[in-house]
Regions:
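Glycine-rich loop/linker segments at domain edges
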Residues: 9, 15-17, 80-89, 154-196, ...
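C-terminal catalytic domains of large/alpha subunits in multi-subunit enzymes
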Residues: 67-68, 228-233, 263-269, 298, ...
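Thiamine diphosphate
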Residues: 240, 244-266, 270-272, 501-508
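Active-site-adjacent "gating/activation" loops or surface patches in catalytic cores
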Residues: 212-214, 458-486
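Short Pro/Gly-enriched beta-strand edge/turn motifs at strand-loop
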Residues: 78-81, 172-186, 271-278, 322-323, ...
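Extended active-site and interfacial segments that coordinate phosphate-rich ligands
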Residues: 17-18, 125-129, 214-216, 221, ...
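Flexible, low-hydrophobicity surface segments
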Residues: 1-153, 264
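Short glycine-rich loop/turn motifs
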Residues: 96, 192-197, 289, 447, ...
Length: 789
């Protein structure tokens, strides 16, 4: 059944009218009678023992420490992994005798206003005894390094090994290229910071936590574990949320504290994260280090990849994903869509005196793509071929689909080489090569870069179990209910914070039932009203929850068809559901009439009517436990000023395949936003720490993010290869735009700097880094000349 506003239609977002008119309801908009504000005393040191906490007499009763929470039976946050050898770190919601990163909460202060709470926090004196600091993950893994957790034998959460012995290939391969590659630590900087309002609902005897989160049910589970109470005594509500990107996809200490205070004080409390807290005290992301070697033949055909990878996971393991998700992903996804036979990868999740690392948009894929795509260009340079040609040499061809790569990742569908060919054509490579050869009048250097990535989404239970996640997803549920006036109410456990679910899920339901979009209402983000879900993350929502919506609506459609046929005195096999009506020949009865019969005139129903009525709860799991793979090739042309180190993006093309697009306009929006964040990763964003573990970027004067003038016009070209395993053939696309830009831009910058003999392998590619690399190369050349003389 095809509809003008169903699957595949460019429908304007239903959410926009409310949000653009300022009618959204965020945590900051909530005002409860008697609500108190919270401020946290945070550690100014990266590693220290707490030898004393002095609270002014006049503020006793307004300041709470871990001793208060522990006395009430509150337990630390405990994020474990199912992978053998994982070391568990327990994170108390307020520091217990020791702090392990700058910004770790030590005490919480309660007052009528945030300003008063901050004044109280400033009056609390904490006595610290400094301890040695681990601020560099490569130093932290060395023998004798000071331990972040005293009872551990070292500073490694987990070491993993994937693949086998490739010594023979290493010894015989005609081409061997090696690189040291590093990605910077980042913050996630959503438009809205984290916020929490907690109160005790005396009527139902529940803690109600309204929080800007991506996963209400998982936060409820974590609170239950920490507070030692049944999940039925906790309700978690996610109101409108101003972006998440992973930062709002975990249980945070402040949520535990707020929930406990609300019950203990029997008063509503609120904590609102300010920007300085986010930059200096919040979870970080992305910091990877690779030692990687590619082996190839004379044409650039990959024979094998060998890599060691380190991920700086910070001081604690985050709930629910654990500290090892990112590194565990690296080992299994590094080969990507490339078809080669020999592989070995060893990874280390390293514990340091920094905030914990959190899965950020793209998770490990951004770092993996940055490393792997540099190696493809390095191989191309070694064999004297165009980088796009070497990609074609190595990408899995469409005739091999479905395809299992060297780490047994099961690729469901796609034509990866075609995405490269279309990107080459769209960027007009020959024209750029001619311009590059002729040179620019202003002396800038032209470079063209490519990057191809794949994005696995809607993974099943086996995949997540293999990564050690204790909270194993694999299915999703949705409720669909025909209202008495013939409308439709959908309830899903995933939470929408920019994914356009109010629109796209309505399109899915409309495709099945034909009910107009304006009569479809979505309820989400509330554990008290929706079915269980592991939340919105990993580009899973449309495949999983959208599949559940479709499944529930199909069951409803069958019930509607049977009742409608009975009302027209026809057999069910003679009836069809079209455009919101059940039809038998030329006769028709509307869904509104059927709903009226069910709710108001049940005496007219058939005797064997399904007693479930016009309300369905359905579960959904894709046809393959491996999920789906969307993919894209990004192509970019840049101009690099070798005197200033400045990079200008001249053209940017994305050729992507998201399978069947429920709403192409929404897909475009996700790609635009992802590319903007990827440009930030590539050129601007870095959270530096000094040797003492002090964060060196506490404002947006120091932590740079791209604005409108830094983000170019992005040209998007859609391919369409439906997944054989999902409803309508959809694939996940939410994170993909952020994965490839760092790799594509790095390759373009290196292409521009090639005449100077300069190669950049670390992100971000800032002017300072580019100028330093040029100066280093010039110094080496001068030293070589002096040596020759």
């Amino acid at each position: 059944m095809a509809h003008a506003t169903g699957v595949g239609a460019r429908v304007r977002r239903k959410e926009d009218d409310r949000l653009l008119r300022g009618r959204g309801r965020f945590v900051g908009d909530i005002a409860l009678v008697g609500m108190k504000e919270l401020a946290f005393v945070r550690s100014p040191m990266a590693h220290a023992a707490i030898t004393g906490i002095e609270i002014p007499v006049e503020h006793r009763g307004a300041v709470f420490t871990w001793a208060d929470l522990a006395a009430a039976g509150v337990k630390p946050i405990r994020a474990v992994s199912g992978l053998p050898g994982f070391k568990v770190s327990e994170q108390p919601a307020l520091a217990d005798g020791k702090v392990r990163f700058v910004g770790e909460p030590v005490a919480v202060c309660v007052a009528a206003t945030r300003a008063e709470a901050e004044d109280i926090a400033a009056s609390v004196f904490v006595d610290y005894a400094e301890l040695p600091v681990n601020s560099d993950m490569l130093e932290a893994v060395k023998p004798g390094a000071p331990r972040v957790h005293d009872h551990w034998p070292d500073n490694v959460f987990l070491e993993t090994n994937v693949g086998g012995n490739i010594a023979e290939i290493a010894a015989t391969a005609p081409v061997k290229v090696s690189r040291t590659i590093r990605t910077a630590r980042q913050c996630m900087v959503p438009l809205e910071g984290k916020g929490v309002v907690a109160h005790w609902d005396r009527h139902v005897e529940q803690i109600v936590l309204t929080t800007s989160t991506q996963m209400p049910h998982i936060v409820r589970a974590g609170l239950s574990e920490c507070l030692g109470i049944d999940q039925g005594l906790i309700r978690v509500v996610a109101p409108d949320v101003g972006g998440g990107f992973g930062w709002k996809g975990l249980l945070q200490p402040e949520e535990v504290v707020a929930a406990w205070l609300a019950r203990t004080l029997d008063q509503p409390v609120r904590w609102t994260e300010d920007r300085r807290e986010h930059l200096t005290a919040a979870a970080n992301c992305r910091e990877h280090h690779y030692e990687i070697t590619a082996y190839a033949d004379e044409r650039g055909r990959l024979l094998g990849i060998e890599a060691d990878a380190w991920v700086d996971a910070g001081a604690y393991s985050v709930y629910p994903f654990s500290a090892c998700l990112e590194a565990a992903q690296v080992g299994s996804i590094l080969p990507g869509p490339y078809d080669f036979a020999h592989y070995r990868c060893r990874t280390f999740s390293v514990c340091t005196n920094k905030p914990p690392i959190v899965p950020y948009r793209g998770v490990a894929r951004t770092g993996v793509c940055f490393a792997m795509e540099q190696m493809i260009d390095a191989v191309a340079d070694a064999v004297g071929r165009e980088p796009w040609q070497v990609r074609l040499e190595n990408l899995v061809p469409p005739e091999k689909m479905p395809f299992d790569n060297v780490t047994k990742k099961h690729f469901d569908s796609g034509d990866y080489p075609e995405s490269v060919r279309r990107a080459v054509a769209a960027i007009e490579l020959e024209g750029w090569r001619a311009r590059q050869k002729a040179g620019e009048a202003d002396g800038r250097l032209i470079g063209i870069g490519f990057a191809t990535y794949c994005e696995q989404s809607a993974h099943g239970t086996a995949v997540y179990h293999g990564w050690g996640i204790p909270m194993v997803p694999g299915h999703e549920q949705a409720q669909a209910r025909i209202t008495p006036d013939g409308g439709l109410e959908l309830r899903v456990g995933v939470q929408s914070h920019g994914q356009s679910m109010e629109t796209t899920f309505a399109q899915v339901a409309h495709e099945v039932l034909g009910i107009p979009l304006e009569k479809i209402k979505l309820v989400h983000g509330d554990t008290g009203l929706t079915p269980y879900s592991t939340g919105t993350w990993g580009s899973r929502s449309m495949v999983m929850a959208g599949g559940a919506v479709a499944t529930a609506c199909k069951t409803l459609a069958e019930r509607l068809r049977k009742i409608g046929a009975h009302l027209m005195q026809a057999g069910p096999d003679d009836a069809r559901l079209e455009e919101g009506c059940v039809r038998v020949g030329a006769a028709a009865v509307s869904i509104r009439e059927i709903a009226h019969t069910w709710y108001r005139a049940p005496q007219l129903l058939p005797a064997d009517v399904d007693r479930g009525g016009l309300e369905v709860t359905a579960g959904y799991k894709p046809g393959s436990d491996h999920g789906t793979f969307s993919y894209a090739t990004h192509a970019v042309a840049v101009a690099v000023d070798a005197e200033l180190g400045a990079v200008e993006i001249l053209d940017y093309v994305v050729v992507e395949d998201a399978g069947t697009m429920v709403n192409p306009m929404v897909v475009d929006g996700q790609i635009y936003g992802g590319v903007a964040q990827g440009i930030g990763t590539a050129l601007y964003e870095r959270m530096p720490y000094d040797a003492e573990g002090q964060p060196l970027a506490s404002t947006f004067m120091d932590y740079l993010i791209p604005g409108f003038t830094e983000v170019p016009h992005v040209r998007i070209i859609h391919m369409l290869t439906p997944s054989p395993y999902t409803e309508f053939g959809v694939k996940g696309i939410g994170e993909g735009g952020a994965i490839a830009p760092p790799a594509a831009l790095c390759n373009a910058i290196n292409d521009a700097l090639k005449p100077l003999g300069v190669t950049i392998t670390n992100s971000p590619m800032t002017p300072e880094r580019i100028l330093a690399a040029i100066a280093e190369q010039q110094a080496e050349q001068q030293a070589g000349k002096r040596g020759a003389a």
